């Protein structure tokens, strides 16, 4: 007995030392017992393949912890991997290899504790139970005991008072003025306007060489470690109705691809450049996280660009991975992802005790998002409209075997709030996935207290003068699609024109580029755009900076005054223009952004540059050309603001990236259509005349008489029938069409008109009224009758 006790004590001590677990207090040896399921709830599904799954869809485990018995209820994490999931490695020659494994089964689960309302779990069952679970505010780590054949596990209790537990910090990059401090009094009001639709974030993970070296044995150890982190992140973000899925990972197994230094801002800048110029060209994702295992002399545990989600250069973050506890690293990933979604650190008055909140400064795994974080996230959605997280990465055919309880409204269901023990929605019957009697809706901006709001109730307020308020229809729980004023609608008392729901001005752009109250500089500063260098140009073609023409000066590099530059964004340049006679000095400041393929230092497209003129790709052009329509650029009628007619509203997402190219393409398309219609029209007229001629010639007549166009009211003898459609002879883009018009004299100019005229008894001619001689296209009417007859 004593020998056995000493053995287990040695095992426990060696296990703790090997794992190096921090932020925990004590441990308890447990023997999880697998329980039979009391019900299947439609879990026996038909799979597309005949390959049986090794891991069950639903599990129950009994864990006796202290004096309590916990029943752990687990459901396999669905849509855990994106449909385009990939894994990338490098060989010893530094050659890159990417594979797309078709993983049909996995051992990662999420769930809760039965009979505990406030509980959650993120567990893998690959080799025993490993992961995180909580009951109320108390959090636990469970792991199998190494070298044990009897199913022993260790359960650690996270200690919020442990010294290390308050040592978590990250680099706090400045938020723009749009991410202002939250007014706590309006928190509930903002939550009432919550966006209920599920969001999707395709997460990609990059592991540096140090992480690889520590986790390369056994071969799949690092894969399972990354999967465990993402499973934890997904569990946390489900509380915001965000589904985080793993798009793939890349392992720098043959050396780091960037320089990783103690200054995390510099490391983030290097990583953002690499992922934009290299990774994005071979992989699609919404956000990428670099896990760095390099020992850096800094207490900072991570860094991210504030509000950077869906932005090519800024949707990335760096997280230090020096601890063996997957849950703590997953918590850091969730924290940095929160910054990318517009969330700031929790502080007064939104303090979050006991390390419970994701955006707090605790190191142990968090439980939830604070009210401030939720409000900041909702405000970010309204202001920035990040489109990438609205895209469901799973096609319909990928979402197999529907069942009641999967939190998706499948065919035949009215609602689905998840498993019975997890459902908290008062409107939905979780057993049958139907609405409870007397209720008409479950959720949505136009659903209140399980009843649809009346027609005309405002469900989305206009955010600015270029936006339009949306109202409920009375028959749908969802708010209608977000629409806004037509592009070109005057805004800010004539200072600008609306563009895609915003009113872009140079003053606002300056305040975003520079910190501390910058505004547009004097108009004389824009003369510097004639220089044709990186601090003054209108177009960037390769490595050549094209100087601005006179008319385009205010659409080149933007010049500001006041504020201070942000070294994080790029390099600034200041000019001092001095007027000796008036003894006046004008300061002109501009910025050249680092590693940015689309230079945001140029004046934004849609910014006013004259009456009826806007900037477009470094040029000042008329609004009709910029927006490719005189209709959409004209203001809406007073009574038509709220309807869906295209002349008054422009849909989101219809922005033309290259206006010039789109305009040329549209012009060619219009010319092709006009040519085809003219050719068809001329052919039909000729065919009709020939047919009528045949009919008249077949009639037996006693004496020749004048044939009048009785049936064809458009034809009269000795009168000209004139077509009003212009013929476009400039048809060089369509050589095959031009060949069919070889008989048309080259002297014809466009536009001109075709005149049909009676030339003789047996022939008809097509004549140009400007020509002295008719061009006759003689037709053999007799042979034509035989062919038609």
From Swiss-Prot:
Domain Disintegrin: 401-487
SS bond partners: 310-388, 350-372, 352-357, 459-479
InterPro entries, per database record: ADAM_Cys-rich, Disintegrin_CS, Disintegrin_dom, Disintegrin_dom_sf, MetalloPept_cat_dom_sf, Peptidase_M12B, Peptidase_M12B_N, Reprolysin_adamalysin
Biased composition (Polar residues): 772-789
GO cellular component, one term: plasma membrane
Domain Peptidase M12B: 199-393
Induction per the UniProt record: Induced by testis factors and androgens including testosterone.
One of the GO BP terms on file: positive regulation of sperm capacitation
Segment forming the signal sequence: 1-23
Alphabetical UniProt keywords: Disulfide bond, Glycoprotein, Membrane, Signal, Transmembrane, Transmembrane helix
Localisation per UniProt entry: Membrane
Propeptide boundaries: 24-176
Subunit-structure text: Interacts with ITM2B in sperm; the interaction increases following capacitation. Interacts with HSPA5 and CANX.
Protein name per Swiss-Prot or TrEMBL: Disintegrin and metalloproteinase domain-containing protein 7
Biological source species: Mus musculus
């Amino acid at each position: 007995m004593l020998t056995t006790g000493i053995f287990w004590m040695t095992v426990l001590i060696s296990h703790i030392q090997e794992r190096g677990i921090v932020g925990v207090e004590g441990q308890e040896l447990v023997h999880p017992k697998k329980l039979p399921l009391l019900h299947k709830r439609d879990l026996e599904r038909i799979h597309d393949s005949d390959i049986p799954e090794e891991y069950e869809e639903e599990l129950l485990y009994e864990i006796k912890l202290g004096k309590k018995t916990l029943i752990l209820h687990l459901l396999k994490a669905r849509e855990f991997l994106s449909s385009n999931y990939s894994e990338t490695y490098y060989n010893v020659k530094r050659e890159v290899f990417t594979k797309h494994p078709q993983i049909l089964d996995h051992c990662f689960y999420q769930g809760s504790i039965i009979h505990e309302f406030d509980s959650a779990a993120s567990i893998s069952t690959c080799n025993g139970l490993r992961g995180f679970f909580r009951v109320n505010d108390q959090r636990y780590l469970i792991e199998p005991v190494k070298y044990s054949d009897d199913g022993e596990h260790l359960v650690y209790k996270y200690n919020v008072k442990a010294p290390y537990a308050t040592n978590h910090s990250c680099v706090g990059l400045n938020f723009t003025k749009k991410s202002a401090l939250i007014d706590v009094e309006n928190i509930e009001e903002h939550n009432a306007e919550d966006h209920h639709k599920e969001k999707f974030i395709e997460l990609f993970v990059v592991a540096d060489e140090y992480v690889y070296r520590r986790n390369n044995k056994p071969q799949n150890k690092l894969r399972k470690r990354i999967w465990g982190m993402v499973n934890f992140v997904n569990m946390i973000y489900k509380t915001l109705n965000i589904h985080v899925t793993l798009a793939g990972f890349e392992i720098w197994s043959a050396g780091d691809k960037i320089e990783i230094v103690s200054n995390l801002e510099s490391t983030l800048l290097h990583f953002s450049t690499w992922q934009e110029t290299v990774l994005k060209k071979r992989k699609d994702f919404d956000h990428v996280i670099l896990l760095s295992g390099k020992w850096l002399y800094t207490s900072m545990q991570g860094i991210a660009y504030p509000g950077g989600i869906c932005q090519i250069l800024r949707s990335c973050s760096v997280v230090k991975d020096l601890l063996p506890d997957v849950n703590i690293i997953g918590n850091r990933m969730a924290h940095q992802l929160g910054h990318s979604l517009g969330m700031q650190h929790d502080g007064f008055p939104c303090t979050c005790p006991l390390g419970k909140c994701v955006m707090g400064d605790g190191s142990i795994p968090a439980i939830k998002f604070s009210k401030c974080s939720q409000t900041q996230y909702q405000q970010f959605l309204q202001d920035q409209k990040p489109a990438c997280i609205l895209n469901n990465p799973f096609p319909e055919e990928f979402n197999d075997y529907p069942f009641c309880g999967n939190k998706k409204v499948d065919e035949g269901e009215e609602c689905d709030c998840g498993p019975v023990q997890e459902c908290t929605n008062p409107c939905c019957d979780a057993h049958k996935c139907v609405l409870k009697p007397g209720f008409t809706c479950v959720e949505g901006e136009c659903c209140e207290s399980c009843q649809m709001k009346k027609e005309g109730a405002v469900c989305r307020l206009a955010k600015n003068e270029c936006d339009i308020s949306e109202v409920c229809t009375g028959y749908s729980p969802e708010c209608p699609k977000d629409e806004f004023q037509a592009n070109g609608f005057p805004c800010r008392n004539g200072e600008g024109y609306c563009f895609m729901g915003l009113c872009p001005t140079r003053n606002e752009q300056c305040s975003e580029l520079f910190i501390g109250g910058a505004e547009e500089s004097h108009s004389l500063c824009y003369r510097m755009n004639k220089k044709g260098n990186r601090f003054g140009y209108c177009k960037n073609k390769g490595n050549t900076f094209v100087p601005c023409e006179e008319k385009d000066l205010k659409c080149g590099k933007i010049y500001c005054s006041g504020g201070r530059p942000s070294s994080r964004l790029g390099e600034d340049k200041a000019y001092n223009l001095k007027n000796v006679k008036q003894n006046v000095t004008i300061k002109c400041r501009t910025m050249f952004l680092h590693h940015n393929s689309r230079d945001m230092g140029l004046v934004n497209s849609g910014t006013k540059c004259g009456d009826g003129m806007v900037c477009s790709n470094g040029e000042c052009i008329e609004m009709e050309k910029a927006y490719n329509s005189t209709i959409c650029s004209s203001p809406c009628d007073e009574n038509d603001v709220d309807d869906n007619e295209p002349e008054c509203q422009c849909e989101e997402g219809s922005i033309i990236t290259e206006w010039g190219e789109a305009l040329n393409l549209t012009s060619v398309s219009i010319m092709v259509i006009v040519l085809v219609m003219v050719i068809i029209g001329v052919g039909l007229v000729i065919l009709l005349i020939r047919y009528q001629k045949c009919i008249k010639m077949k009639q037996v007549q006693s004496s020749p008489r004048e044939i009048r166009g009785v049936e064809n009211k458009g034809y009269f003898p000795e009168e000209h029938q004139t077509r009003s459609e212009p013929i476009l002879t400039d048809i060089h883009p369509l050589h095959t069409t031009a060949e069919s018009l070889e008989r048309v004299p080259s002297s014809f100019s466009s536009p001109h008109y075709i005149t049909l005229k009676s030339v003789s008894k047996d022939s008809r001619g097509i004549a140009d009224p400007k020509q002295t001689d008719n061009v006759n296209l003689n037709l053999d009417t007799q042979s034509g009758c035989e062919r038609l007859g």
